[in-house]
């Protein structure tokens, strides 16, 4: 058999975040231990019935089984624009400022190929979703990480970035509500970021997949596009995955600056064939009729969040009370690294949590809990951790 060599770009990939965890998990499971996984952020609840029924009807239409538009059906893009107007007060032209995605991950991964040339500098706020820097590397860009520190509420210190760096930078990736820290960003932060990026012609790529998982009705996470002038420099990536428990459906959208949207569309035109039209039709129903479901979903996550926070604080584990996302970002006990603590928790309790350093160097000293099992299992998981 021929010995084929992988492309050099794959040699630069960091180890898969969950590879080591999966190995230990298999060893623990082989001992007959009941595993509770609070690792990957994948909702445990079903897609709501009204969306499933819309999908059934859409599947029955023969036209939906043909090739879809690579940018998304105009009706889907129009509904995205309607939702943005209703939710954020942001006006979008569905023809030029909205594009459908096969999940936001696809769009984020493709985006650097549209605007980053070899050697271009891209700022990535970290700890972070790994796709930002991996996609940048694949496109030949140079990554400079910008730390998100607890003392700055897990926001990047924009003033600490030298002017020469801003002059060199082509793009910056930001993500709020944030994975993994669960931090939120106030409108004032976006205003400052937009001002700087307009001054230095830096593209803002904003991942905002968690805006609808929030816990304060009077302080809902904003869109960066709510800032006047943001469309000059920003594109925002969103998804139906977390909002409607649709991770497996693979549907999302990117909105904002028409040139940025068109550039991403040019990549997609040559790299994929768009979202299955039946999924788009069901997604129209989700965006149009899903507000009541989202309210109920937030109530469930709020109860789960409170269960975990109360138990962690009682056990002496430090963590902030998240105002958004379905994650809890907690400090590991003194004397442990993130990896050591997570491994010990798994080996001794059968509970899977994610080491903070897997999301970047500033994540060292933290671990992430996903609120993606029911309340009874969460109570059991945290009680096991508390006994360590």
Curated annotation (Swiss-Prot):
Gene Ontology molecular function: any one: L,L-diaminopimelate aminotransferase activity
Binding site residues for substrate: 16, 41, 105, 129, 179, 368
Coiled-coil ranges from the UniProt annotation: none
Cofactor(s) needed for function: pyridoxal 5'-phosphate
Keywords: Aminotransferase, Pyridoxal phosphate, Transferase
GO biological process: lysine biosynthetic process via diaminopimelate
Binding-site residues, pyridoxal 5'-phosphate: 70, 104-105, 129, 179, 210, 239-241, 250
InterPro entries: Aminotransferase_I/II_large, DAP-NH2Trfase_DapL_Desulfo, DapL/ALD1, LL-DAP_aminotransferase, NHTrfase_class1_PyrdxlP-BS, PyrdxlP-dep_Trfase, PyrdxlP-dep_Trfase_major, PyrdxlP-dep_Trfase_small
Modified residues (N6-(pyridoxal phosphate)lysine): 242
Pathway(s) it belongs to: Amino-acid biosynthesis; L-lysine biosynthesis via DAP pathway; LL-2,6-diaminopimelate from (S)-tetrahydrodipicolinate (aminotransferase route): step 1/1
Disulfide linkage: none
Function summary: Involved in the synthesis of meso-diaminopimelate (m-DAP or DL-DAP), required for both lysine and peptidoglycan biosynthesis. Catalyzes the direct conversion of tetrahydrodipicolinate to LL-diaminopimelate.
Protein family membership: Belongs to the class-I pyridoxal-phosphate-dependent aminotransferase family. LL-diaminopimelate aminotransferase subfamily.
Subunit-level organization: Homodimer.
Protein's name according to its UniProt entry: LL-diaminopimelate aminotransferase
Species, as recorded: Nitratidesulfovibrio vulgaris (strain DP4)
Chain's gene name: dapL
């Amino acid at each position: 058999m021929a010995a084929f060599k992988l492309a050099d770009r794959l040699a630069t990939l960091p180890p898969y975040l969950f590879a080591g965890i999966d190995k230990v998990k298999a060893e623990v499971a082989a001992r007959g231990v009941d595993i509770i996984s609070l690792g990957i952020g994948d909702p445990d609840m079903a897609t709501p019935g009204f969306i499933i029924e819309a999908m059934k009807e859409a599947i029955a239409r023969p036209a939906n089984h043909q090739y879809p538009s690579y940018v998304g059906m105009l009706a889907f893009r129009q509904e995205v624009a309607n939702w943005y107007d209703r939710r954020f007060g942001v006006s979008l032209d569905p023809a030029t400022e909205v594009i459908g995605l096969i999940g936001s991950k696809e769009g984020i991964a493709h985006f650097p190929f549209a605007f980053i040339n070899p050697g271009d500098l891209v700022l990535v706020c970290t700890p972070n979703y790994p796709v930002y820097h991996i996609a940048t590397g694949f496109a030949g860009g140079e990554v400079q990480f910008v730390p998100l520190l607890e003392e700055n509420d897990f926001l990047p210190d924009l003033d600490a970035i030298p002017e020469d760096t801003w002059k060199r930078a082509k793009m910056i990736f930001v993500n709020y509500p944030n994975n993994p820290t669960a931090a939120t960003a106030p409108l004032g932060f976006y205003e400052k970021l937009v001002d700087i990026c307009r001054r230095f012609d830096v593209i803002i790529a904003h991942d905002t997949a968690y805006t609808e998982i929030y816990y304060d009705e009077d302080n809902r996470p904003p869109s960066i596009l709510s800032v006047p002038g943001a469309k000059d420099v920003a594109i925002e990536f969103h998804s139906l995955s977390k909002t409607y428990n649709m991770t497996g459906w693979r549907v999302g959208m990117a909105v904002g600056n028409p040139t940025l949207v068109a550039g991403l569309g040019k990549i997609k035109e040559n790299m994929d064939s768009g979202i299955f039209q039946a999924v788009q039709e069901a997604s129209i129903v989700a965006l149009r009729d899903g507000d009541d479901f989202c309210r109920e979903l937030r109530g469930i996550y709020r109860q789960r969040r409170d269960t975990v926070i109360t138990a962690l604080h009682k056990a002496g584990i430090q963590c902030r009370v998240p105002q958004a996302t379905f994650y809890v970002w907690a400090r590991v006990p003194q004397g442990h690294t993130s990896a050591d603590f997570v491994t010990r928790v798994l080996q001794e309790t059968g509970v899977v949590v994610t080491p903070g350093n897997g999301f970047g160097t500033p994540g060292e000293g933290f671990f992430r809990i996903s609120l993606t099992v029911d309340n009874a299992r969460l109570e059991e998981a945290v009680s096991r951790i508390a006994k360590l």
